């Protein structure tokens, strides 16, 4: 985001603490510091390039953790006391709109809202405590809050995070999640990668892929309509799965995937 956009959101929300990823984001906040006098602290995560910054306004994430540990030693019951004092009606998340038709606005979500959302989703499509979920989207997006916070609290599954943004695809293969949630552009990007690899493969491989893909589409139609597949199609799909779909899922990290959610925009029928 540009500094004026950041200034607007901080003024709009009245935030007193800001979490910045790295030096680049910290510098943006310095540009608008005079416009955000209510911000008491800026907490930065990546310490690269921050050695020369000597300002009590700034705190490294490591410093925050150490302060928390020290506070815990002095006040061992502080967290439990705060939990008992908390109310389901308290605001826990400000969800920003996209701002495509004007300046962004913030929807005020309470603890009750998020937990109810998680419970409702569990009733419709239950997830298991033994499931692994891969979280690689911004937590500022309400869709990721829904999965990584609300659904994780109500379903009890493990939330995994990539080591770095650049290693997300490799981490996906290593984790092999049971559940994923992504906007259409992510699924479309994965589909494009598959298409590129197929288009660069030998002609015979492309022929096999196209033939077996048709079998997969036919099987998917029966599954989506909840109808049993004819015997011939079941056999053809089993063969297609062994030859193409299962190895492909393994390469993508989808071998254990049971739930692939999407939201935020329309998903193309081909995907």
Segment roles from a protein language model:
Residues 1-31, 117-134, 165-179, 251-253:
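Conserved ATP-dependent adenylate/AMP-binding module captured primarily in the ANL superfamily
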Residues 21-22, 46, 90, 183, ...:
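Helix N-cap/beta->alpha junction signal
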Residues 23-38, 187-201, 242-255, 269:
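Adenylate-forming
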Residues 137-141, 264-266:
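Conserved AMP-binding
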Residues 1-67:
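Structural core segment of the AMP-binding/adenylate-forming
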Residues 115-132, 139-242, 256:
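Conserved AMP-binding/adenylation subdomain of ANL enzymes
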Residues 58-59, 63, 69-96, 103, ...:
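Conserved pre-ATP/AMP-binding loop-to-beta segment of ANL
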Residues 6, 90-121, 129-136, 145, ...:
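Extended, hydrophobic alpha-helical segments in both membrane/secreted and soluble proteins
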